[in-house]
């Protein structure tokens, strides 16, 4: 796809590693100036590597649960590079697995704040810039667990289902304004979080996906880049499953 994002500015949250880092690299390779919003200092390493490769990139320390922090991220992107054309709302955390009757309310609130409210805040403040420009593309990161049930997954499943319907609502709200909003719903992917799990757990995850393996972060990044690009100009409100067939069963 060459320079599909030439002269465009993309904000990617949660890009210190995994899907976010792969997405930041891919968008930069295709011409975008990339602004990474993350609390983790590893995001600075990603941005530095992109600059060393000749791309435009910077890291802005961002807490997606803090509205002022999110607003500052979007404003910095627009001020530094002249516009804000693409948002990839990827920042998220996992949950402590437990049945609902053993719910840790503090942990529930933390997951909802980061995985759902954080996406909403990023959209809110990206849309300030996109609405003024009359164009833009937002890609939120949901999950297969936003579409299907899994035992002992309360907060994460609720948050990711919320992201999916938040995406649909925003999509129909802003489509006529030249702003497209879509989401990806990844299956189990070979991210650092998963890499730290026992081998038998990783094998079970892979076996649940008809394709028989974990997704590579770069494969999910390709789907995100498609939805953010002009190639998806008529795609609005889609929740694109990138799950190796998990939700097709």
UniProtKB/Swiss-Prot annotation:
Q: Which Pfam families match?
A: adh_short_C2 (PF13561)
Recorded GO molecular functions are: oxidoreductase activity
Per the record, the coiled-coil ranges are none
- What are the catalytic residues? 156 (proton acceptor)
Q: Which Gene3D superfamilies match?
A: NAD(P)-binding Rossmann-like Domain
Enzyme Commission number: 1.1.1.438
Positions contributing to NAD(+) binding: 38, 63-64, 90, 156, 160, 189, 191
What InterPro entries is this protein classified in?
NAD(P)-bd_dom_sf, Sc_DH/Rdtase_CS, SDR_fam
Query: The organism sits in which domain of life?
Result: Bacteria
Recorded catalytic activity of this chain's protein? cis-4-hydroxycyclohexane-1-carboxylate + NAD(+) = 4-oxocyclohexane-1-carboxylate + NADH + H(+)
Primary enzyme class: oxidoreductase
Q: Determine if Oxidoreductase is one of this entry's keywords.
A: yes
SUPFAM superfamilies in alphabetical order: NAD(P)-binding Rossmann-fold domains (SSF51735)
Q: Which family does it belong to?
A: Belongs to the short-chain dehydrogenases/reductases (SDR) family.
Q: Which PANTHER family match?
A: DEHYDROGENASES, SHORT CHAIN, ESTRADIOL 17-BETA-DEHYDROGENASE 8-RELATED
State its role: Dehydrogenase involved in a cyclohexanecarboxylate (CHCA) degradation pathway. Catalyzes the NAD(+)-dependent dehydrogenation of cis-4-hydroxycyclohexanecarboxylate (cis-4-hydroxyCHCA) to form 4-oxocyclohexanecarboxylate (4-oxoCHCA). Is highly specific for the cis-4-hydroxy derivative and shows only weak activity with trans-4-hydroxyCHCA. Cannot use NADP(+).
Provide the assembly information: Homotetramer.
What is the protein's given name?
Answer: Cis-4-hydroxycyclohexanecarboxylate dehydrogenase
């Amino acid at each position: 796809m060459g320079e599909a994002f030439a002269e465009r500015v993309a904000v990617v949250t949660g890009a210190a590693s995994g899907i976010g880092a792969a997405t930041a690299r891919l968008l930069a390779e295709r011409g975008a100036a990339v602004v990474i919003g993350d609390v983790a200092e590893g995001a600075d390493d990603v941005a530095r590597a992109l600059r060393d490769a000749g791309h435009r990139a910077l890291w802005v320390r961002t807490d997606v649960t803090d509205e002022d922090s999110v607003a500052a991220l979007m404003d910095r992107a627009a001020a530094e590079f002249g516009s804000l054309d693409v948002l990839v709302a990827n920042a998220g955390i996992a949950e402590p697995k437990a049945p609902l009757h053993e719910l840790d309310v503090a942990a529930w609130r933390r997951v909802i704040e980061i995985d759902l409210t954080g996406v909403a805040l990023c959209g809110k403040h990206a849309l300030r810039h996109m609405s003024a420009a009359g164009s833009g593309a937002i890609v939120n990161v949901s999950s297969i667990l936003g579409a299907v049930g899994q035992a002992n997954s309360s907060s994460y499943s609720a948050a990711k289902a919320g992201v999916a319907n938040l995406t649909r609502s925003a999509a129909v709200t802003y489509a006529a304004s030249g702003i497209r909003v879509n989401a990806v719903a990844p299956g189990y992917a070979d991210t650092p979080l998963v890499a730290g799990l026992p081998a038998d757990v990783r094998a079970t995850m892979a076996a649940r996906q008809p394709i028989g393996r974990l997704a590579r972060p770069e494969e999910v990044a390709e789907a995100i880049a498609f939805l953010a690009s002009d190639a998806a100009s008529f795609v609005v409100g889609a929740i694109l499953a990138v799950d190796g067939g998990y939700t097709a069963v």
